[in-house]
Amino acid sequence: MTSIKPAVEPPAPDHPAVTALPGIGARPAARPPVTSRWRWVPAFFGWFVGIQAILNFLSSISPFIRMVTKLPREFVDEYLFGWPDGSLSWAFVLSLLAAALAVRKSIAWWVLLIDLLGRSALNVGGFIEHRDTTELIGLVVHGAFILLLLLARKEFYAKVRRGATVKAALVLIAGMAAGTVLAWGLLELFPRTLVPGDRFWWALNRVAGFSIASHRDFDGLPPHFLNWLFGLFGALALIAAAIVLFRSQRAVNALTGDDESLIRGLLERYGQDDSLGYFATRRDKAVIFAPNGRAAVTYRVEVGVCLVSADPIGDKSAWGQAISAWLQVCDAYGWAPAVMGASAEGALAYREHGLNALELGDEAILYPRSFSISGPHMATVRQAVNRARRSGLSVRIRRHRELSAEETKQIIVNADLWRDGNTERGFSMALGRLGDSTDGDCLLVEAIDSTGDPVAMLSLVPWGTNGVSLELMRRSRQSPNGTIEFMVTELLTRAEGMGITRVSLNFVMFRSVYADGSRIGAGPVLRLWRSVLMFASRFWQFEQLYRSNVKYQPEWVPRFACYEDARLIPRIGIASVIAEGFLVLPFGNRDKPRHTGQYSAVPQAIVATGLLHHDGSTPELLPQTAPQQRVPEQVKVRLGKLAALQEKGIDTYPVGSPPSHTVAEALAAPDGSEVVISGRLLRIRDYGGVLFAQLRDWSAEVQLLIDDPRLHEEFTAAVDLGDLVEASGVMGQSNNGTRSVLVESWRIIGKCLHPLPDKRKGLTDPEARVRARYLDLAINPEAREQIAARSAIITSLRNTLLAQGFLEVETPILQQVHGGANARPFLTHINAYNLDLYLRIAPELYLKRLCVGGVEKVFELGRAFRNEGVDFSHNPEFTLLEAYQAHADYVTWAQTTQRLIQNAAKAAHGAEVVMRPGADGRLAPVDIGGEWPIVPVHEAVSRALGEEVNAATEVPTLQRFCQSAEVQFNPRWDAGHLVLELYERLVEKHTTSPTFYSDFPVSVSPLTRPHRSIAGLAERWDLVAWGVELGTAYTELTDPVEQRRRLYEQSLLAAGGDAEAMELDEDFLRAMEYAMAPTGGMGMGVDRVVMLITGRSIRETLPFPLAKPR
């Protein structure tokens, strides 16, 4: 958060989350580096004591094992470690000690050390008293273990609950006392032979002394079953004390007002991505912030698992620091780190810090723009909505802040009344509070019956600034079927009016199991797993949740669980069940509506800003500033000049006022003429007393002359090359006779912040010229000539047709059917109609509709799009001229097309010439005047092959010709396609001066009329010049029956996978059935005509050709 970033980053006092953290500039590590040679010791003692606990347990429940292990058990119990006969309680205590040792609990180290020291003392005493060398064996073992514990002392760093030792001692004393008193009372009732004076001491010995005194020390014996019961009393007291002593530190601290305020600030600034981010404000969670306060993770601790919900919140660049701080806290307290409900991006961040990720399920996301209940796949929802409407339901949608106090109370009452169960469930995907003043942006959707009473509600929390995430769903048992569907549909229908573009519904665990497990071919393991979940759904409604969401056809977004050790997954599962409220423990801290935190986790430097609110509301955020960019030194200098000018009150980007002259007009004006000109400075020469500058506008370039000392000083201090300048003065000449503007005043009208390329060399890299066309135009006269020539050519094409009485029209670019040419289209989608559309490959079919309507001369000059290759003559979007004339044919259009191109060449060059590279590589004019030849395509192919080819030549012969000419072909092609391939490879590429190739096979001309005299041919020509096809023309096919047959054949090719084949356009065919006059049509690639006339490539002639991403 830029607005509350501290100047320094001290750790927050009294909070473990920010102690001993790496610096912000360093990459945080998931764990401290493992360099200690004693790192293995806690695991060793954990396993050692754990095995002892297992053996104790087995010998306690199995007489056979107890008999087999009698001798070693007695030896171990006497000389090494405690192994009482048949004590389940002792096995339980040992298992708790083993677990505490494994997670590095410092208190477990002390317990084991004290136990070993005590047993060592007993061994020493036994040796002194009995001189038994066996005592020395035990002493050596104890000494080795004690030494190992002392050497590894720093490895047992995990903290325990504050005051856990005192609490454990009090529990033990209280338990022993209660057990002793109860045992004494039972002995008074059932003494058997035990004398009254020994009854209290017997009870104390059995309960608290674990039978240290022998029964021979007492007068008489109690009943046998009481002895077992008294031992159980002592064992229970010991177990309770051990649980208190060794159980994991639990995070009793929850959010404070400052914590929540900073979390809300992070959500306000960075909370656009995670739909679960707002649930971080749940007040029964604790929080750990990154040291700089720009990111945080929220968590709860259950059964020793530190459970984080969803992704970290805040700046993604600080996520690593927050995760690292959280993992260090887990280490400090011996918690097992785990995450529930992380997104794919969040799971990746956790994985980078040493955790593993497991897909948990999917979240259902709906987008109002594309949501619709029409169509067969939404029949269930549509029927439910109609049913709810018929029952008289209506829907009311409001923000929580719009509710009155009475309405809020009633909402809370209804939510409690309609809740299914006694416990409010949720942790990672539920808020757990209603009616809080800080949640005013939450959305309430209510279903209202015909009497005006609410019968159901949805509460949704904010998801960034343009989304909502479902938090609460309630309905009365009296609400009609379809109520929930009605509310969801109405929410999505009205969402865009409320600025909502995305809605997150429920999270569905194991969604893929339900989706894939019922499909044909699902494996036995998947089917078994689905059956298990189906059974579990009787209790937890997993399947019902899936069914209730899948009917809306949502987008499923995966969510992940993250963990450190796979062996801890069962415990993590239990912790998740507890956190989500499916298992309720006594003395829980769920659903706290108020702040109960004892201390704030916010870094002190942020607290000191005073921007946070103690009630937890969103802090006062300063406007977000753009990130600082590293700029070159020359740019820094120019920015400095800009700032200096602005400080003086000079507007460096003023409102425009037209100059009195262009540069060309000023140069034509006589000396002494007053002129005001503007343009870009391309060169500055300072000779001390006089300054010369070259100024260029679109028309020409002129020299500025400044000899006034004041103007000279101001100009040199403020101006750089590339600046746009307006200069006023009189026309004159310099000493060497150069025409100049003698400057009397000037002003900057646009400060250039980057240096220009070299004026003489310009942009030498062709790719740079494409990407920075604006610079190329600014400094390169040839680039200006190209764009001017293109404009002149397009204007000439338009004017030539307009002069012949043609109408210019515009037809749709977005089309439902791609047709008019054989080419691969671009596909897009319109959300309003949930409909796929194509960018047009040609306007032909719409122009022909106009011809059917009686427009006799019509043309369109516009953009077309083809998803094909990019090279010197192809660009994915291009300018296309298509024109149609009634009562004309392809011969008519040959004459018109020749005239169009010759006129365009004259407009660009002043003569009917095109520019072609000469022998020296330089462009030279080539005359294209006169009549252009018309050559039948079969004749041209025959010349190229040296073999006779005509319309009757059969396929095998044409295939043989292709093989001999090394022309590749598809064996399934007919004769027409083979001739076309031979033409394109052998004729078109080798053509020089403009030539019309005519009479193509019918099979490659689906929209062309059959030749009037030669069967199998179509009245079509292609115009080719210097290896490039410039255009094509047809005598149009006007027979609707034949047209339908040909387009049907094309549609079969499209259905068979031919991406370039035309689809069947029924609207076009229906229009043709109303009859179109005999018509000739022509299509011309305008970009290629510009290339022909200027001698440049398509990338040079287009102002902005498509360039690869950087």
UniProtKB/Swiss-Prot annotation:
Annotated cofactor note: Binds 3 Mg(2+) ions per subunit.
UniProt region (Phosphatidylglycerol lysyltransferase), positions on chain: 1-620
Entry GO CC: cytosol; plasma membrane
Catalytic activity entry: tRNA(Lys) + L-lysine + ATP = L-lysyl-tRNA(Lys) + AMP + diphosphate; L-lysyl-tRNA(Lys) + a 1,2-diacyl-sn-glycero-3-phospho-(1'-sn-glycerol) = a 1,2-diacyl-sn-glycero-3-phospho-1'-(3'-O-L-lysyl)-sn-glycerol + tRNA(Lys)
Family of this protein: In the N-terminal section; belongs to the LPG synthetase family.
Role description: Catalyzes the production of L-lysyl-tRNA(Lys)transfer and the transfer of a lysyl group from L-lysyl-tRNA(Lys) to membrane-bound phosphatidylglycerol (PG), which produces lysylphosphatidylglycerol (LPG), one of the components of the bacterial membrane with a positive net charge. LPG synthesis contributes to the resistance to cationic antimicrobial peptides (CAMPs) and likely protects M.tuberculosis against the CAMPs produced by competiting microorganisms (bacteriocins).
Name of the featured protein: Lysylphosphatidylglycerol biosynthesis bifunctional protein LysX
